[in-house]
Amino acid sequence: MPVITLPDGSQRSFDHAVSVADVAASIGAGLAKATVAGKVDGKLVDACDLISNDATLQIITPKDEEGLEIIRHSCAHLVGHAVKQLYPTAKMVIGPVIDEGFYYDIAYERPFTPEDMAAIEKRMMELIEKDYDVVKKMTPRAEVIDVFKARGEDYKLRLVEDMPDEQAMGLYYHEEYVDMCRGPHVPNTRFLKAFKLTKLSGAYWRGDAKNEQLQRVYGTAWADKKQLAAYIQRIEEAEKRDHRKIGKQLDLFHLQEEAPGMVFWHANGWTVYQVLEQYMRGVQRENGYQEIKTPQVVDRILWERSGHWSNYAENMFTTSSESRDYAVKPMNCPCHVQVFNQGLKSYRDLPLRLAEFGACHRNEPSGALHGIMRVRGFVQDDAHIFCTEEQVKKEAADFIKLTLDVYKDFGFSDIAMKLSTRPAKRVGSEELWDRAETALADALNESGLEWEYQPGEGAFYGPKIEFTLRDCLGRNWQCGTLQYDPNLPERLDASYIAEDNSRVRPVMLHRAILGSFERFIGMLIEHYAGVFPAWLAPTQAVIMNITDKQADFALEVEKSLNGSGFRAKSDLRNEKIGFKIREHTLLKVPYLLVIGDREVETQTVAVRTREGADLGSMPVAQFAELLTQAVSRRGRQESE
């Protein structure tokens, strides 16, 4: 007689084993219809699974995060059902859930086309309308093998081989189609109505380019059609903001096949880049950092000593010269330790903060490259703080404050902070981990802001703090990091003279605020849709004459503004003023200055914003003051 305890503390007794669905039905017909699965003693199970002993139970519905994930996973199985009906010779591989959706990898004799994707989606809708039950059968291993052998599902058989200890497996039947999964899955296709297939791509078996190529069908699924519509609208907005598209429109950069994953910065984009670099240079100088520069190409010996060669060699670009092996640096930290090691260091020299706008190169797979967001050549606002263990908390607290201030300057105020703690495989004593985690946690607490733990997600040598920004579309971008590291100083023999004249290893804090400049600029482009705040805009003001008679004054204004440190250009083309205004509005120039006869006579400029606001005529000095205020606000709102 199982006694079922519900989340509100109420209990229900049964005189026999009972399924999750039966418990839901005993509560009410509405809940029974909405039941996707259950959580029994904290473990997710199918709605059809039986509960034989006393247990706690949470009914999972589409409103729950777990329910939504189950819907997405079941939609992947539905893709399999539709594909096997339309393309019987296709072989199904895997269909996992991903962020906001799912995909299914499929082996087929030819690449799928957009027309194929439309046909698969149409068949999925037809199958959903049949309103059939999804049937789960726990099946002995030998029978599972027989099922997939009979169906010619070679990849499923390989997956079974990967699980030698599993003697029974869950098979989920969508009518004649069967798939293997740990589950749980929806009990009926009625839960799958709010879905859409989104794109096709190639993939490789087990993610290895040496293996056979597969087709990957991506999709998204939601609890209801309202949520689906909101998601589609968000995706459409994201497509409009695609940094690759805007980068071309605003003449910021380009990429080309001859240099995969390397950015060709155009004048406009390089201006944005330089503004970022000069801003970060000033921030670091004001906060006690020394800027250094280290070599691009370093002997293999250093990478072996640092441990990167054994763990990271396949991602490094290498070369040989005069019987020596070299690597283009994928990161700056070993080189910064070399700078620290030059000359004897005392405890009085600590903390020592070394910063570099370090150009790094990593041999990322070509399929992983994405515009300027994921590249092979990039520059980081990289710095390393060498300090005593007692100084860690203050250095971390100062870094947290600095990082949040920088993000505000770029217009980001929704920041999530997470502390990743010791993983199962780690080096160092428990006492050292305790002290390191406590120091970082105390520093986070000093910020007065919310943060959360990520248990087990730290590096094998130390805990770390991660900063994740949420942009205007609600997307999360992990940018800043502070990594506690006693390991690299040990490997590279860094030390300082302590107060008692003993040699002691410093703690090394790896830190970055923006991360990769390339990726951060891509984020800014999409966050602002190219409508940069005045301080970041490649051109801050354009001066336009109505007729040739005003050309000389327009050039005077341009010279005056540029002489004051602004970025201004004049447009003296023999075009209608309305045409010029429209063109520069589309180019997202913050301020449009129009000069006619009256402005020449009064030595003023007629000021418009790219949003269409008419600010009226004013002396150039007054406009310069207005622009100064806009630039000084950076990305902050006037109220901040």
From Swiss-Prot:
E.C. numbers: 6.1.1.3
Cofactors: Zn(2+)
UniProt cross-references to InterPro entries, sorted A to Z: aa-tRNA-synt_IIb (IPR002314), aa-tRNA-synth_II (IPR006195), aa-tRNA-synth_II/BPL/LPL (IPR045864), Anticodon-bd (IPR004154), Anticodon-bd_dom_sf (IPR036621), Beta-grasp_dom_sf (IPR012675), TGS (IPR004095), TGS-like (IPR012676)
Region (Catalytic): 242-533
Molecular function via GO: ATP binding; metal ion binding; threonine-tRNA ligase activity; tRNA binding
A single BP term in Gene Ontology: threonyl-tRNA aminoacylation
Gene3D superfamilies found in the cross-reference section: 3.10.20.30, 3.30.54.20, Anticodon-binding domain, Bira Bifunctional Protein, Domain 2, Threonyl-trna Synthetase, Chain A, domain 2
Annotated localization: Cytoplasm
Domain spans labelled TGS: 1-61
Co-factor binding comment: Binds 1 zinc ion per subunit.
UniProt keyword terms in alphabetical order: Aminoacyl-tRNA synthetase, ATP-binding, Cytoplasm, Ligase, Metal-binding, Nucleotide-binding, Protein biosynthesis, RNA-binding, tRNA-binding, Zinc
Any one annotated GO CC term: cytosol
Functional summary from the UniProt entry: Catalyzes the attachment of threonine to tRNA(Thr) in a two-step reaction: L-threonine is first activated by ATP to form Thr-AMP and then transferred to the acceptor end of tRNA(Thr). Also edits incorrectly charged L-seryl-tRNA(Thr).
Family membership: Belongs to the class-II aminoacyl-tRNA synthetase family.
Subunit structure: Homodimer.
Protein name according to UniProt: Threonine--tRNA ligase
Organism expressing this protein natively: Pseudomonas putida (strain GB-1)
Gene name of the encoded protein: thrS
